Design a protein with these regions (language model features):
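Short glycine-dipeptide loop
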Residues: 18, 42, 113-118
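A short acidic, Gly/Pro-enriched loop at the edge of an enzyme's catalytic core
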Residues: 79-90
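A short SAM/SAH-binding and catalytic strip from SAM-dependent methyltransferases
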Residues: 89-101
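C-terminal lobe and adjacent flexible extensions of AdoMet/dcAdoMet transferase-like proteins
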Residues: 176-182
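Class I SAM-dependent methyltransferase SAM/SAH-binding core
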Residues: 22-24, 28-80
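C-terminal alpha-helical "lid/dimerization" subdomain adjacent to the S-adenosyl-L-methionine
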Residues: 120-174
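A short glycine-rich, Lys/Arg-flanked "PGG" loop and its adjoining helix->strand segment in the class I
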Residues: 103-115
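Conserved alpha-helix/loop element of class I SAM-dependent methyltransferases that forms part
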Residues: 1-17, 34
Length: 182
């Protein structure tokens, strides 16, 4: 329940077998299996990016244990990217709310997205509809460096056209699916 909706969000990327995918804030690689299910091992490629070397060490172990040969791991700051290439799809899976300069991370995602590409953000929302429990959840998440009271959806709509935002589980989380024109 804590990290609800990963499969649905990855499906919204609209991946093809030959897609080139970037996951920003990949952490330990928990989303890799969902993404790789859509990619052909010889044609599609997944690049996992994270700021934390410790998280990437765990992701590296996961990749090696499963024998995934079409996964690259990069340690970098999502707000200052220069990967030298563009991607068909970019995914933020419960990571945007942990990035202090999150607008810069979204701008960098836009720069690294190919024309016609898709960016999907799946993250915690404001918990509207949770009544007196909302501040408790937000406080607990803040202890874990997750900030939910920022206008993520508004920035997505500003940067990506079209952009569709949906809320799930009474405002527990949201998906924002944005595109960059042809």
């Amino acid at each position: 329940m804590i990290l609800h909706g990963r499969q649905r969000a990855v499906a919204a990327l609209g991946l093809r077998p030959d897609s080139q995918v970037l996951e920003i804030g990949c952490g330990t690689g928990l989303n890799f299996r969902h993404i790789l299910a859509y990619l052909a091992p010889a044609a599609g490629r997944l690049t996992g990016l994270d700021f934390s070397a410790d998280m990437l060490d765990q992701a590296r172990k996961r990749v090696a244990a499963r024998g995934w040969l079409n996964v690259d791991l990069v340690q970098a700051d999502a707000t200052q990217l220069d990967l030298g290439r563009r991607f068909d799809a970019i995914f933020f899976g419960y990571s945007l709310t942990m990035i202090p300069d999150w607008p810069a991370a979204l701008r960098q995602a836009r720069v690294h997205l190919r024309p016609g590409g898709t960016v999907v953000v799946l993250d915690f929302s404001r918990f509207h509809g949770w009544g007196p429990l909302a501040p408790l959840w937000r406080g607990w998440l803040r202890l874990n460096h997750v900030e939910t009271l920022r206008p993520y959806e508004d920035e997505m709509r500003r940067l990506f056209e079209p952009c569709e935002v949906r809320y799930w589980l009474g405002g527990y989380n949201f998906t924002a699916v944005g595109r960059v024109g042809p």
